[in-house]
């Protein structure tokens, strides 16, 4: 502060009638006066100081005034800090609000996507089911029924042809089974099952016949 203001020890009156020379002494440096040009009140005060002669008490008061202004400037410097902290708190609050909003938006988006997927699955048409994709019903030989498999019934023509084939061959090869299935409009499984049942029946008949022959032979031996 001493560089900007006249020293208080500087004599107010000069000997030898040199008081007129006092008004020519600049009270401020050139750099300080340049900075004061931006503030009209400060430059006005500077011109008044150059025109008039003041006592040391005035300089002290002026220094106090400027010191107060300096203190106010320090307070002014602290004021933006307060605003900065307030801005930071506001920014943090806005960030939290934005995070909450984004979470809510995410929840709503997820629910909307879920509903869209649900409705899309409902609106989607069913996959076409072709005859070869359906289960074969053994009751009538027609596809499309998924109930319990019933007993297969054969027509007289089918039964006659199968009996002829069984009379010549009790066991069928794969090629022969395919040929018969195409000729009688049956599946390979149906023909295979028919031959299995027919062989079981044939075995039972032969067993009964053999047991009857054995019993007859035993009776003839006892009688003889």
UniProtKB/Swiss-Prot annotation:
<dbReference type="InterPro" id="IPR020479">
    <property type="entry name" value="HD_metazoa"/>
</dbReference>
<comment type="similarity">
    <text>Belongs to the Antp homeobox family.</text>
</comment>
<keyword id="KW-0371">Homeobox</keyword>
<dbReference type="GO" id="GO:0000978">
    <property type="term" value="F:RNA polymerase II cis-regulatory region sequence-specific DNA binding"/>
</dbReference>
<keyword id="KW-0805">Transcription regulation</keyword>
<dbReference type="InterPro" id="IPR009057">
    <property type="entry name" value="Homeodomain-like_sf"/>
</dbReference>
<keyword id="KW-0804">Transcription</keyword>
<dbReference type="GO" id="GO:0009952">
    <property type="term" value="P:anterior/posterior pattern specification"/>
</dbReference>
<keyword id="KW-0238">DNA-binding</keyword>
<dbReference type="GO" id="GO:0006357">
    <property type="term" value="P:regulation of transcription by RNA polymerase II"/>
</dbReference>
<dbReference type="InterPro" id="IPR050296">
    <property type="entry name" value="Antp_homeobox"/>
</dbReference>
<protein>
    <recommendedName>
        <fullName>Homeobox protein Hox-B6b</fullName>
    </recommendedName>
</protein>
<feature type="DNA-binding region" description="Homeobox">
    <location>
        <begin position="147"/>
        <end position="206"/>
    </location>
</feature>
<comment type="function">
    <text>Sequence-specific transcription factor which is part of a developmental regulatory system that provides cells with specific positional identities on the anterior-posterior axis.</text>
</comment>
<dbReference type="InterPro" id="IPR017995">
    <property type="entry name" value="Homeobox_antennapedia"/>
</dbReference>
<dbReference type="Pfam" id="PF00046">
    <property type="entry name" value="Homeodomain"/>
</dbReference>
<dbReference type="GO" id="GO:0000981">
    <property type="term" value="F:DNA-binding transcription factor activity, RNA polymerase II-specific"/>
</dbReference>
<dbReference type="InterPro" id="IPR001827">
    <property type="entry name" value="Homeobox_Antennapedia_CS"/>
</dbReference>
<dbReference type="InterPro" id="IPR001356">
    <property type="entry name" value="HD"/>
</dbReference>
<keyword id="KW-0217">Developmental protein</keyword>
<dbReference type="GO" id="GO:0005634">
    <property type="term" value="C:nucleus"/>
</dbReference>
<keyword id="KW-0539">Nucleus</keyword>
<feature type="short sequence motif" description="Antp-type hexapeptide">
    <location>
        <begin position="129"/>
        <end position="134"/>
    </location>
</feature>
<dbReference type="InterPro" id="IPR017970">
    <property type="entry name" value="Homeobox_CS"/>
</dbReference>
